[in-house]
From Swiss-Prot:
The keyword DNA damage does not apply. The lineage of its organism: Eukaryota, Metazoa, Chordata, Craniata, Vertebrata. The chain crosses the membrane at residues 19-39, 53-73, 82-102, 107-127, 139-159, 221-241, 307-327, 347-367, 376-396, 400-420, 438-458, 466-486. GO terms for cellular component: membrane. Its main location: membrane. It is a multi-pass membrane protein. The keyword Glycoprotein applies. This is Major facilitator superfamily domain-containing protein 4A. It comes from Homo sapiens. It is found in: Membrane. Glycans are attached at residue 177. GO terms for molecular function: transmembrane transporter activity. Keywords: Glycoprotein, Membrane, Transmembrane, Transmembrane helix, Transport.
């Protein structure tokens, strides 16, 4: 039947849970990209200055990181995982519905902190559940999972765009400190075709401001539409809970007689079962605990140093690549409008959309590619492509055409790095480590830290440092990946892996070798 036939067979057997995990990542994508284009309207709504509204970004990113690190608490049983996904996806709809009523920036930051916790929980739990369900065949399904992030991230700005205010709600005399570069991070995320004439404003609060032309009311419609669009996602999780008989209102009713197949399954010794072929609720839950439990597990005491080195180097690779994704999408506009390029505001506003568009396209293309190419090879191509692209951008830093081509190229190379890296690292550790939690946490820390670091360097050294930072961080990612390959080659494998598990790995290696 071949590799493709086995993968399609696995998908048919696990169709409903797979579609459910994909859909919750669509919620993740919706929530991660809406703040940028709506930030100016939200600033008018909350009567806040740019430094004040910046806490909204910080609270979301910080709580996303906390949610990713603590999400492992809900992964010990299938019931806990599904209830966590249901609560998180429902919370995202509630956040969208409540945002129009947040008239104070502190309240808005608190609401976005809740959204960040929900997003972090979704990030960890959905990734881990797919890896647990498909194991060596998980690369294709992880690529689809992260495609839905890009799809949601593309859709939310498109929904918000018709409702954005074209009028400036700030008074004309509030243009002091317009040369301040400290706010480029925030302005770069929101200056698009509807805000091409906007400039950074002063660090003061405007208590008497009211949005003109009903701007606050109009943008409220965008949030309510996104809340409705996201509402089927928690319903899908609820249906999966019902199917698995995990709803408290649906008591389990056992049949009086078992069929021959069910009887054979009941009487089969558990130690001879193939974990990858069992439903998720029967699979082993060891090795995928939260970050703190992973560090305290007694069976890790005898693990070789390469076991820990694989965790660390894998997390460092994603620290760099995911951090570059966040930093580039945040600062590419600011870099374009500065000298020497001096691109017009309207033209530069297309760069973040181009970047996310090619990330989505890359994740779509990587779905068939990942079924025919090893994850290690895909990560190598991605990391080398990132370094080469930044070098080309640095050499041709005066050419606007190369900036657009390089932005599209970076989107393609960065698109599939995370799912490929996750599949490769889990495969290297034979699904017995804490790779999912550690890698998700490392990626979250990188996205938060590198944005702050690049922003500080950009402000202090000028626009040229933006590309220099990209080259440096790309080279660091490549170095950490070479170290990961080295530690993987030295890794002897875990002694606790049963013999049959090893034979399963040899069988799967026909189409998914390490």
């Amino acid at each position: 039947m071949g590799c493709d036939g086995r993968v399609s067979g696995l998908l048919r057997r696990n169709l409903q849970p797979t579609l459910t995990y994909w859909s919750v990542f669509f919620s993740f994508g919706l929530c991660i990209a809406f703040l940028g284009p709506t930030l100016l309207d939200l600033r008018c709504q909350t009567h806040s200055s740019l430094p004040q509204i910046s806490w909204v970004f910080f609270s979301q990113q910080l709580c996303l990181l906390l949610g990713s690190a603590l999400g492992g608490v809900f992964k010990r049983t299938l019931a806990q995982s599904l209830w966590a996904l249901f609560t998180s996806s429902l919370a995202i709809s509630l956040v969208f519905a409540v945002i129009p009523f947040c008239r104070d920036v502190k309240v808005l930051a608190s609401v976005m902190a809740l959204a960040g916790l929900a997003m972090g929980c979704i990030d960890t739990v959905a990734n881990m559940q797919l890896v647990r369900m498909y194991q060596k065949d998980s690369a294709v399904f992880l690529q689809v999972l992260h495609f839905f992030v890009g799809f949601g991230a593309l859709l939310s700005p498109l929904i918000a765009d018709p409702f954005l205010s074209e009028a400036n709600c700030l008074p004309a005399n509030s243009t002091a400190n317009t040369t301040s570069r400290g706010h480029l991070f925030h302005v770069s995320r929101v200056l698009g075709q509807h805000h091409v004439d906007a400039k950074p404003w002063s660090n003061q609060t405007f208590p008497g401001l009211t949005p003109k032309d009903g701007a606050g009311t109009r943008v409220s419609y965008a949030f309510w539409i996104m809340a409705l669009i996201n509402l089927p996602v928690p319903m899908a999780v609820l249906m999966l809970l019902s199917k698995e008989r995990l709803l408290t209102c649906c008591p389990q009713r056992r049949p009086l007689l078992l069929s021959a197949d069910e009887l054979a399954l009941e009487t089969q010794p558990p130690e001879k079962e193939d974990a990858s072929s069992l439903p998720p609720k029967f699979q082993s839950h060891l090795g995928h605990e939260d970050l703190f439990s992973c560090c305290q597990r007694k069976n890790l005491r005898g693990a070789p140093y390469s076991f820990f080195a694989i965790h660390i180097t894998g997390a460092l690779v994603l620290f760099m690549t995911d951090g570059l994704t966040g930093a580039y999408s945040a600062f590419v506009y600011s870099y374009a409008v500065e000298k020497p390029l001096s691109v017009g505001h309207k033209v530069a506003g297309y760069l973040p959309s181009l970047f996310w568009g090619f990330i989505t396209l890359g994740r779509l293309l990587s779905i068939p590619i990942s079924s025919r190419m090893k994850p290690a090879t895909m990560v190598f191509i991605n990391v080398v492509g990132v370094v080469v692209t930044f070098l080309v951008l640095l050499i041709f830093s005066y050419n606007v055409v190369f900036l657009f081509v390089g932005t599209a190229s970076l989107g393609l190379f960065l698109s599939s790095t995370f799912p490929s890296m996750l599949a490769y690292t889990e495969d290297s550790l034979q699904y017995k480590g804490c790779a999912t939690t550690v890698l998700v946490t490392g990626a979250g820390v990188g996205e938060m830290v590198l944005q702050m670091l690049v922003g500080s360097i950009f402000q202090a050294q000028g626009s040229y440092s933006f590309l220099v930072c990209g080259v440096i961080f790309g080279c660091l990612a490549f170095t950490f990946y070479i170290l990961l390959l080295f530690f993987h080659r030295m890794h002897p494998g875990l002694p606790s892996v049963p013999t049959q598990d090893r034979s399963i790995g040899m069988e799967n290696s026909e189409c998914y070798q390490r």
